[in-house]
Amino acid sequence: MRDCCSSPKAIPAPPRHALDQSLGMDPRHTSSSGAAEGASCSERPAGSLACPSPNCSPLPETPRAHGALTSDNSGTTLFGKPEPMSSAEATPTASEIRNPVFSGKMDGNSLKQADSTSTRKEEAGSLRNEESMLKGKAEPMIYGKGEPGTVGRVDCTASGAENSGSLGKVDMPCSSKVDIVSPGGDNAGSLRKVETISSGKMDPKTENVMHSRRERPGSTGEGDLVSLRENDMKPPDNTDSASTKKTDPEFSGKLTPGSSGKTELVSSVTVAPVTSENVNPVCSGGAGPAAVGNSETLSSVKKDPQLLGKKEAVSSGEGGSVSVRMAETVSARQPEGMFPAKTDSTSSNSTGPSGRADPVSLRNSELVSPVKPERLSSGQAERVSLVKTETLSSGKEDPRSSRRVDHTTVTGNMQTSQKGNPESSGKTDLGSSSSGDTRSLGTWGSLSAAKAEVTEGKGDPQPWKKASLPASEKTDPLASSKAGSASQGKAETVSPGEVDAMTLGKTVPTSSGKTALVSPGKVDLMTSERAEGIPELQASEKGNPVNSTRVDTGATGSTEPKSGVKVITQIPGATSPGKVETPSLQKEQPQLSEKTDPSRKVDPPTTVEPVSLGKADSASPSPRKAESQTSAKTVPQAPDKATSSLRQSDGTPYSSAQPQRDTRSIGSLPEREPSASTSQKDLAAAAAQKSPSAEAAAPPPGPRTRDNFTKAPSWDAGAPPPREDAGTQAGAQACVSVAVSPMSPQDGAGGPAFSFQAAPRAPSPAPRPPSRRDAGLQVSLGAAETRSVATGPMTPQAAAPPAVPPVFPEVRVRPGSVLAAALAPQEATEPVRDVSWDEKGMTWEVYGASMEVEVLGMAIQKHLERQIEEHGRQGAPAPAPPPAVRAGPGRAGSVRTAPAEGAAKRPPGLFRALLQSVRRPRCCSRAGPTAE
């Protein structure tokens, strides 16, 4: 890789030279210059490295490229180098396309923008350019770029866009650069590093990365991605270089950013690679580039005061870097000013966690940073974090900053995106994301960015809306769905790709990685293209910031994909979109394994969705289809996963929103994208999985259990309940049934239990009358039986029932007298029967507290009195009636009265004993017999 790097380095002279020219031109930002450079770039690209290529590419972006270059030359180098890599692929296209488009557009636009932005950044003239480039330019570039190739290219250039351009194809290179910058996954590491590197280091590293990337392009393969991811992951810093190298391979390059030492990074990277091409270019590229470029520039400028502080931080801490970078990027890009402080802080915050805190951060970040974050974010959750933070931080700023940044950053990107591309869109999404929104995201992201860009992010809403529509068209669908998913998953822009969402959902890192995968421009592309139209509304609808975030991811993924679609297609250069995606996915999938599988398979519902993305990507060779599928599917999946993640991380909202969006997107996409059979399949699979999962999971267990329990218990309860108290009976039976059912076949167990319960109750008419009589008392009865059942589910029931029935009959007989006929007797009788006569029942009552102790005691007393009277001990018929009458009015009254009479008739000790017995079941049972 280094060697490659060396080559680039060797070429460096030309590249740098070119850069210089480029820079010179950049400052001029002459379109012709850009064109020329583009030509030269092409020529240089002929040189493979033809750093000029980057320059060329960037030339249009030259400002951007310049920025990139400025970024440290790294940009150039990166740029150049990656470009070489990309260059061949992307550069020409990007160059031509980009240059023209961007050149004019970018130059003027970005230049101006850049200039103003850069102004602050001025410090880094290149920064300025770069930033401009990145920001104004790169984005525009990207925007203009709008072309896949261009995008790829633009990203590079624009992103300094290298990222963008690079992103797409250059992505690798650019990515490298950006990646280096951070754009990639390293985002954090890389970014940081890159940033640092970028600053000074970047050059080499960048170059390396570029080179690496370049070299790796082939490699880029997935391995790179993967390895990148891993490597990057591991050594973000190193990764920067190494990773970068690794990453270099096209995706790798991208990955690198993505690889970003972290998966997230990877994600980013991946995204960068896959998405990267798409997303990353935009997001990454844009954001990354912009951010990166910017960052780089920042990095470069790092030196910038603002950056400096930040940058230093950035440089200093890689995470810091990232953060800073991000922030810077954001800031810078944002307008540096905008976020800087905030970003910085945020970034910092983020960064720390950034890393991975990133998911959330990421999401935000991505959003915020989107452009950068995306890349960064994506790649780097950190960045994301940063971004996120920014977003968060931005929170407020968010709209402005974030959005602005996003816009701006994104905007640039977005524009680019818009124009440029899905990618941009994606990016924008990111930006948007920040702002967010699904709707926005994809949409606005695209649009907004493009437009709002766009402007600003200020116009966030507008941009969003605007962007939304366009973006929406483009990104939204996918973005929406995807973003939703992605967003959801992570919102993460990170996922920029889709995965992000998924991944995000899953893990930022993993997600990232995966996302990157999924994200991979492919899905995104597809989705983007596909979704674009469809989800537009969705995206629009989604336009929520939150959504944005979410969408962002999706959008990013999506958008990027869009861009990516093209880009990817071209970039596929590295690999065919389908292929690349697949590889990336596959590769990353391994890492993401869960995800991956799903990705490929889409089986895992959760994973599937995101994976779906991946899968769709993989499966559907046609990115678009896959994308659609993925998109559709991913969204769902991502939602699931993401939802979980999001819910947890992000919170339900994302999830919720996402799901809806996703669903919608999905529905939409699938329908609209039927073209992609894969998508449909994926969707179907996803749906099936999802539904099935839900159905199977919830229904099977629930239904079976419920049916079994409910059925057995219900039936049991049904028959007995009438006889006894519904509440008690139900509880008892249910308990019994449940206990029995679970263990024994529910049917068998349930049946027996029923039989027992039913038999006891059926045999004794008492139960039925009790139901007629006092519900409370009856409950006691039922409870007693039930308890019996519970105690001795099978045998005890039989035994208990016999005991109970006798008691009941006795009670009945006794109450059967005139007193029994009376209402009071009914109430009292039942309770008394259960309580006094049925020891178990009584115990149950007491312990179960089915009835209040006092009530039971009174009932018992009454019952005893009646019995006594009946027996004739002291019982004169006269006394009995009064109790009945009194009882009628109320148990309490009757009881009290009865006791008085009873006392007169009988020894007070008996009553006392009864009362005590109530409290002491055993005594009570003794008392009863004694009383009699």
From Swiss-Prot:
Residues annotated for lipidation of the kind S-palmitoyl cysteine are: 923-924
Q: In which tissues is it expressed?
A: Expressed specifically in brain (at protein level).
Q: Where is the composition biased (Low complexity)?
A: 31-43, 424-443, 479-491, 684-697
Modification sites for Phosphothreonine: 795
Q: How does it sit in the membrane?
A: Lipid-anchor
**Any idea which residues bear Phosphoserine here?**
22, 33, 190, 369, 377, 393, 495, 519, 714, 817, 836, 917
Highest taxon of the source? Eukaryota
Recorded hits in InterPro entries, A to Z, give:
GPRIN2-like/GPRIN3, GRIN_C
Q: Where is the composition biased (Basic and acidic residues)?
A: 118-138, 202-217, 227-251, 301-313, 395-407, 594-603
Question: Which parts of the sequence are annotated with region: Interaction with GNAO1?
Answer: 821-932
Q: How is it modified after translation?
A: Palmitoylation on Cys-923 and/or Cys-924 is required for membrane targeting.
Specify where it is mainly localized. membrane
Transmembrane portions of the chain: none
Keywords annotated in UniProt? Cell membrane, Cell projection, Lipoprotein, Membrane, Palmitate, Phosphoprotein
Amino acid composition bias (Polar residues), ranges on this chain: 257-281, 343-353, 408-423, 545-561, 583-593, 642-660
Q: Name one Pfam family in it.
A: GRIN_C
Q: Looking at the UniProt record for this protein, which Gene Ontology cellular component terms does it annotate, in alphabetical order?
A: growth cone; plasma membrane
Answer whether the UniProt record assigns the keyword Repeat to this protein: no
Query: Which GO biological-process labels does this protein carry?
Result: neuron projection development
Q: Where in the cell is it found?
A: Cell membrane; Cell projection, Growth cone
- Region (Disordered) location: 1-149, 178-808, 866-908
Q: How does it assemble?
A: Interacts with activated forms of GNAI1, GNAO1 and GNAZ.
State its role: May be involved in neurite outgrowth.
Q: What name does UniProt use for this protein?
A: G protein-regulated inducer of neurite outgrowth 1
Gene label:
Gprin1
